[in-house]
Design a protein with these regions (language model features):
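Extracellular/lumenal glycan-associated surfaces
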Residues: 156-162, 184-186, 214-229, 287-301
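Bacterial N-terminal signal peptides
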Residues: 21-31
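Long, compositionally biased interface segments
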Residues: 38-40, 44-46, 271-363
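Short, low-complexity cationic-aromatic patches
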Residues: 153, 183, 206-217, 275-291
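Short helix-loop boundary/capping segments
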Residues: 198-206, 216-270
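N-terminal secretory signal peptides that target proteins for export/translocation
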Residues: 1-16
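Sec/Tat signal peptide C-region and signal peptidase I cleavage site
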Residues: 31-37
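Solvent-exposed N-terminal domain segments of exported/luminal and surface proteins
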Residues: 38-199
Length: 363
């Protein structure tokens, strides 16, 4: 029988306990760090705010009573330059569009793009090469295919609720067409994919920063605008956003309260451990010890694909007469123009409907 000396036995026992101790400490540190995730109202630009942010009681979608920051933002931040959107003619250059039909990809709105759509059965221009442009979506369209360039309404205000401390959901919430994603630090709301031309027949043109005007008259993003040039470089698109670009800077807070960043982490590396929502736990400038946050990617739209946390009820309300967040959201009919499509195999939730829907507000 081999007898282990007492000092070696103690060392063996200590070594056996070490992994559990390290694991426990790691879990404790992770939980402590996660608790640091919070919305900081002072980060939002005063150029977008109608009044100072307020802390209010709110109810999350899962019934949790908590505290939210309430921000009342303008139709567009003071001094923000937007456009171009729809080009007046084929000789002009407009914004961008992520085409999801045949020859799919990210395109500049120019002659080559619209002539390509012509070959696919979508006709956005007349014989004189002027585009069909709609600026008022309350009116019935004359043409089957139109480029949407909605007029701004300076009177519109938007009220946004963000949980001050994020609460992780039991399951991530998928983000469909025109789903509410968050509020950029410049005060511009952020939404998921704009409605497809394949569904509506119309093209809601985006400018080169990935934004456009809602039917209600207010400007919003469909991309991480402060890192969108990464997309152009990746996909070979000749475009540039006039906003300062940064791979690492915080762009926004999602509606669940978690922060949103560019394509790289605080150390300048592209994260390799992103989850299905394009998020992960890792260090940020405000929390070097780590917090959960989302990252932009090199695919359009470079936004979260789902939300990890729980959002507040009534988290986006506008004073607009139509569009998202207003009492009136017009219905979406079958997409006019283009070749006939067989939608019999599409899930019922994807079928065009006459019922009001968020997606319909940007036909």
């Amino acid at each position: 029988m081999t007898i282990t000396p007492p000092h070696r036995a103690a060392a063996v026992r200590h070594k056996a306990r070490l992994p559990a101790a390290v694991l426990s400490a790691s879990v404790a540190m992770l939980m402590a760090a996660a608790a640091h995730a919070e919305v900081v109202p002072s980060q939002f630009s005063s150029a977008a705010l109608e009044k100072a942010p307020e802390t209010v009681s709110c109810t999350l979608e899962n019934g949790t009573q908590t505290q939210c920051t309430r921000l009342v933002v303008k139709y567009k931040p003071d001094g923000l330059k937007t456009g171009p959107f729809c080009p007046p003619s084929l000789d002009d250059e407009g914004g961008i569009w992520d085409w999801d039909g045949e020859n799919s990809g990210l395109y500049r709105l120019d002659r080559a793009f619209f002539e390509m759509l012509d070959t696919l059965g979508f006709h956005f221009h007349d014989d004189d090469e002027s585009l069909h442009i709609m600026t008022d979506l309350s009116k019935r369209p004359v043409e089957a295919n139109n480029c949407l360039n909605v007029a701004e309404d300076e009177s519109v205000e938007m009220t946004v609720l963000l949980p001050l401390e994020p609460v992780e959901a039991d399951e991530p919430t998928p983000l469909g067409t025109v789903a509410k994603i968050g509020l950029a630090l410049d005060g511009v709301p952020i939404f998921a994919d704009a409605p497809s031309v394949l569904d509506t027949g119309n093209l809601p043109a985006l400018d080169t920063c990935g934004g456009h005007v809602d039917p209600g008259g207010w400007y919003h993003w469909h991309a991480t605008a402060t890192d969108i040039d990464t997309l152009y470089d990746e996909h070979g698109v000749d475009a540039h956003c006039q906003l300062p670009q940064s791979h690492t800077a915080q762009f926004a807070y999602a509606f669940d309260g978690y922060p949103m960043f560019g394509t790289q982490d605080s150390g300048g590396s592209v994260p390799t451990d992103l989850d299905s929502c394009n998020g992960h736990f890792g260090p940020t400038e405000r929390h070097p010890e780590g917090e959960y946050h989302y990252h932009a990617t090199d695919e359009f739209p470079n936004l979260p694909k789902c939300l990890k946390g729980v959002v507040a009820k009534d988290n986006f309300v506008t004073t607009a007469s139509m569009g998202i967040g207003s009492p009136r959201i017009p219905g979406q009919g079958p997409g006019p123009g283009g070749p006939e499509k067989d939608t019999s195999d599409r899930p019922e939730s994807d079928q065009p409907s006459e019922a009001p829907s968020q997606a319909s507000s940007e036909q």
